[in-house]
Amino acid sequence: MQLLMLAAYRSEKYKKSVKFLFPSSIAAYGMPNLKVKQKAGTVKEEEWDIPHTMYGCNKLYCEKLGMYYSQYFGQKHLDEKPPVMLDFRALRFPGLISAFTLPSGGTSDYGPEMLHAAAQGNRYSCFVRADTKISFMAMPDAIKSLLMLMDAPVKSLSSRVYNVAAFAITAEDFRQRAVNAFPGAKISFEINPRRQGIVDSWPEDIDDARARTDWGWKPDYDVDRFFDDYFLPEIRKRYSLVGSH
């Protein structure tokens, strides 16, 4: 809030709108149960914004604050000559995966954790069901989307908050990729009810048509290119060094 207030005051004082870019998350969504999630399929930005976690609540809260400071700050939009307000823009990211950093225990990290374990010849117990499905994205695409939204002309934007998507796959899809890449990988499914409940509250996929239309969003990495050209080559490099020093 402090940063938003500062940006809003500077926009008004210097009569030039400050761009404020915020990384939001699919955690801002909240589906009531698995049946509703599966029926909903691909979800738009304004649908099912009822998060089940404190993390998701805070992401949604920041989105709403950004909208307020961009449009209604102090109700000054009602003035005869409204001041210049800040230019808030947010991206709702899916599960982000980097080939260069280790997964750190996030709720969507079961996929990369599985592959890191398989590459090292370690057993892995996945904490969600095999059929669990959500959207994921390669880190280079996440960076690309941030830069694209930052550079987009304000006149082309129809929203303050945009979904961006790349590919949606199941935990079983990750397991199959791990087994194919590292034969003999030992992966089981041991469900953690609380973590499963969180992932079940997130949509299977997100609709990013608005971003594609408004500012030309398109990911570089589909599911095959993500694994074959980005993630697996770097994982192999990382663990080929184990024990070599």
PLM segments and residue spans:
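Conserved active-site helix of classical SDR/Rossmann-fold NAD(P)-dependent CH-OH oxidoreductases
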Residues: 2-3, 60-67, 71, 111-112, ...
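Conserved Rossmann-fold NAD(P)-dependent oxidoreductase catalytic core, especially the SDR/UDP-sugar
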Residues: 3-54
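Hydrophobic structural elements of the Rossmann-like NAD(P)H-binding subdomain
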Residues: 21-23, 80, 91
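Conserved sequence/active-site signature of Rossmann-fold short-chain dehydrogenase/reductase
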Residues: 26-29, 96-98, 142, 169
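Active-site Tyr-X1-5-Lys
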Residues: 31-35, 50-89, 118-120
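A conserved pocket-lining segment of Rossmann-fold NAD(P)-dependent short-chain dehydrogenase/reductase
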Residues: 46-50, 77, 90-105, 113-137
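Glycine/proline-rich active-site loop of Rossmann-fold NAD(P)-dependent oxidoreductases
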Residues: 60, 84, 96-112, 139-140, ...
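C-terminal substrate-binding subdomain of Rossmann-fold SDR/epimerase-dehydratase oxidoreductases
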Residues: 122, 127-129, 135-245
